[in-house]
Amino acid sequence: EVRTFWNTQNGLRAIEEWEPNCWVQVTCPDESDTQFLEQKLGIPEYFLGDIADTDERPRYDRDEGWVLIILRIPYVKEVRSRTPYTTIPLGIIMKGDICITVCNFETNMMIDFVTYQQRRGLGFTDSVDMVFRLFLSSAVWYLKRLKQIQSLIDQSKRNLDRKVDNADLIALSRLQDSLTYFVTSIRGNETLLSKLKFKLKVDELDADLIEDVNIEFAQARETAGIYTNILDSTMDTYANLINNNVSQVMKMLTSISIIMMFPTLMASLFGMNLINGMER
């Protein structure tokens, strides 16, 4: 459980307790965090349940003045996981002078987001500015993770060029699944972003920031699409190669079986109780 209160006026500065217009960052919330958010700040109970759903799609919701925004951000599991690279929901909850982010996983993206904003030393103009900066950060991290995926694909291909191994084929299959999750989540975030332009109060600075986010998401989507096509083609190539190898082996085994069958066939013929002309 990590609950941090950030003063966002002049850069990000950690403070001891909640105050109006601060950013409440909650990571891996436990029961005490849930009580604080629901009882002290008064957020709707189902908001946290929606954020905790790992399959929750990117969306915007509004309930009695409360705004819930869920975007999907990249997340790295264990390397041997079924999908080493996947996406998880990040929830942003706002109302008046209250701004909260909730994530049920500890991510490099959020750590980097805080570090980068502190380095900028500018903070956020308002909650809407922070929302779009989180979108921008997620797009940048999608591109970072995609580069890592491409590096793993290249490594597996080099290994397969030397020797076709099941472990490398399984690794490529897992990365194929990861790319599917990335493409789906990026498209969902883009759709959500287009809605937020009309749902939130967007000023001129926000409009420029949204344009930057659109560019980054478009690049991430196109990159993920290219890697997906390359990986699909690679998997098809190795599948054909394996099929050809199996066909060659089967032909050889068939030839050996036919050759080995002749002695048995001759013995069977001469062992029959038939007159063959050689008995006289």
What is each of the regions a protein language model found here?
Residues 42, 218-280:
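Hydrophobic alpha-helical transmembrane segments and their immediately adjacent juxtamembrane loops
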